[in-house]
Amino acid sequence: VRRQLAPKKPSRKSSRKNNSLNKNKNEQAGDIGAAILSHRSGGAHGVCKGGGMAGNTSHKGLDFAKAVALNIEIGVSSLAAFDEVNAIAGAKIHLKVETGMGRNGFSDEWPELLSRDLSKVVGVMMHFARADEPNEAQNKLQIENFEARIAELKAKGVNPIRHISNTAATLSNESAKYDMVRVGIAMYGMSPLGRDNNLKPIMKVRAKLVVVKELPAGHPIGYGATVVTKEATKIGIVGVGYADGIPRNAVGAGVTFNGQSAPLIGRVSMDQIAVDLGPNTEAKSGDWVTVIGDNFDIYDWAKACQTITYEITTRISGRIPRTYIES
């Protein structure tokens, strides 16, 4: 992102009042990417104003003119998209090139692209396949391929802004930083390389206890009765479930109430999870708990679900209202 984005409060109202997601408002710059044209311009989480860069655009039919009017520089990875954007007065284009990811980016169309009018090209980019494995030879090979493309552009009179580093490369590869970087998960205060004490997670998911009740020892919990209480205890039913983005296969996670951990028990339901609050808890129906954050952060949930932190952050559904706060 090349310029500051102006944050805005969420515009969508939710009928579910028993949960919320808090993020530092500056996070909005992190998910601009490919979704900006279809989602961010007047979308659910705010309006992009005053510039930025939308990347990874390979297909036609998006409202490129609106993006240009908002002073957004557009990344393209196909000849069809390039021709469409290049025809717009005032457009600024970033070319995405294929260097070894095997996904989108100019490859077979590259020679034909070089025959086009490149006067609106201001940047060139690529994406690493193995940036979270800093010592892999493929990273060096991709940089070499990228440098070859830069040389070809310069031979055509283009001196582009160069950017190739995602979060992993930004944190681990000094040689890959070039003119700017494109951090994603780091804007959430997380690292794909594991916990980083220099980064502070900014996203927190909270929900309310809809029921708190006592159960005797030997009582089954949830679908399939996969868990039975070992002793008399109080369980809390939290108003959030897999329809809200809480993975159904979570094992070993939990919530935080008044600084105390309450482990998840039983299977995650569509709209609810059950947690063991302990026999002496003072929790009551209507109290807030922290589902993601505090004692069970994104890393804990990712481990509990045998997945990556990216999946946990991106799967939080639109049923949960967003609140942006300043720290």
Language-model regions, residue ranges each:
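Active-site anion/phosphate-binding pocket segments in diverse small-molecule metabolic enzymes
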Residues: 1-7, 17-28, 58, 78-83, ...
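Active-site-proximal beta-alpha core segment in soluble small-molecule metabolic enzymes
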Residues: 2-163, 177
